[in-house]
């Protein structure tokens, strides 16, 4: 039996927000794909105008590729011939319809909407331009509508209409009842799904659908519209072989492709850039981009790397083949532009292709050398969403660094146990710090930031005006010499390494000012992918926001360079769970605008809005 969604290329496109809680009891509901389900409220969109989503909607529903039409036409005509030969094919539509424009001359997409959706469109935008508008209503007549559109009264009439029209694709654009009927009748090939990361009152909701019948095949970059983050998913029908890339190949395709980009970067091969998903011509649904949006061509060396990794024919490939039997990732995306996949792709690459090594802790690791991640702080706050992170602990530790503190008890008294294992008597004795008091961590990060070169005695002494205050110098340079190439903060003091409970992992960062914006690049020599790196991404992103504010700048980018990147053997099973999860849109970070001195920030000055996340994943720290 033919799949009509594929024959007639019927898609759904929608934008959904989080639903504002209506009672105290609903505030702590766990997050899930159904978190984003709000479609409308009182006859209009729940949110105010979201320009990014509107551009995306317009781009998706107006884009056509003339070169592919003949193939689509042949497919539809073949179906109609087969239908006719079987005695079917009643092509008489029951609807009373009209249409504006000569469909035969210009290839366009069809947009199908219910009456309420049609009436919610502002008058100046009716009918939606450069699209064949179809309104589904049992009560609307052509006398009720001044604009020239098709009016039909059932989904069956829509199928009859599509048999007659010359069109590229058909998009169901709302409302909830139309979505529900098309999904229940298996008439949707793909769902273009915008996740608006804000909570609003809603009275209309996107219908539930069988997620075993659809899988996520694309996750876009994270964008920001007037302070609200959003991203774009594509759900593809399982086994449909659709444009978004649902295929019957390996279920590890998604992360393998991301890992290939990570591997290419480790091998000094430039990774392909991703065009923003502003329409179906982007990588968001697998079609070739027009020239100005197309990613740059790969180098011969990169093509070789990609080919070898895909075919599993290299030395690493043979290792991957056997490992794949263990790694049963459910994610089947081909096109993953969400920034969190940089992190997930590195983990996947290390698990599949890493070198097995012993390590200081005795646990053992798989490791690789040299990765890079970039995060756009002007759009979002990169707090990982595939597991819940201890944000309060991240902020308290950063403030502790900024104050130049080395007393682990300060954090423990706030129930922040990040450094607890490194301050025990046993750990300090193993470091030959027999004279050191428990939880005296020595001249670690904060001491080097604020007192570089000073003689360290113990955690109780006063070091005011001793050593070099690197943080103060960094802020001074940003304010007074913003083009300086010496705006560097370094925690790696060779003379003090033996006195530290733990030598610094993130050892150096540099700041860059351009066009009123501040970027930070950080080099991390030792990178615990399971536990440490998620904290480091968030911490240095917050740090960049703080320094930008006190210097009257806007945050731009955080760039994370990873040296020895490793996965502990006792973290692998937990990380497999994390790799199965689809990221949510990142949250946003707001600082108290009244704070102008870096030392004046307190925990109450930080607000994280719309942090949607998966459940916590427990991993034991290797100390």
From Swiss-Prot:
GO terms for cellular component: cytosol; mitochondrion. One of its GO terms (molecular function) is dihydrofolate reductase activity. Its EC number is 1.5.1.3, 2.1.1.45. The active site is at 505. Residues 291-304 have a biased composition (Basic residues). Disulfide bonds: none annotated. The keyword Protein transport does not apply. Residues 88-103 are annotated as: 3 X 4 AA repeats of G-G-D-N. Coiled coil: none annotated. InterPro entries: DHFR-like_dom_sf (IPR024072), DHFR-TS (IPR012262), DHFR_CS (IPR017925), DHFR_dom (IPR001796), Thymidate_synth/dCMP_Mease (IPR045097), Thymidate_synth/dCMP_Mease_dom (IPR023451), Thymidate_synth/dCMP_Mease_sf (IPR036926), Thymidylate_synthase (IPR000398). Residues 337-623 are annotated as: Thymidylate synthase. It holds the Pfam family Thymidylat_synt. The keyword Methyltransferase applies. Sequence repeats lie at residues 88-91, 94-97, 100-103. It comes from the Eukaryota. NADP(+) binds at residues 15, 38-44, 115-117, 137-139, 153, 174-181. Pathway: Cofactor biosynthesis; tetrahydrofolate biosynthesis; 5,6,7,8-tetrahydrofolate from 7,8-dihydrofolate: step 1/1. GO terms for biological process: dTMP biosynthetic process; methylation; one-carbon metabolic process; tetrahydrofolate biosynthetic process. Substrate binds at residues 13-14, 53, 173, 179, 194. PANTHER family: THYMIDYLATE SYNTHASE, THYMIDYLATE SYNTHASE 1. In the N-terminal section; belongs to the dihydrofolate reductase family. In the C-terminal section; belongs to the thymidylate synthase family. Bifunctional enzyme. Involved in de novo dTMP biosynthesis. Key enzyme in folate metabolism. Catalyzes an essential reaction for de novo glycine and purine synthesis, DNA precursor synthesis, and for the conversion of dUMP to dTMP. The repeat region is missing in the pyrimethamine-resistant isolates BUR-98 and BUR-151. This is Bifunctional dihydrofolate reductase-thymidylate synthase. It comes from Plasmodium vivax.
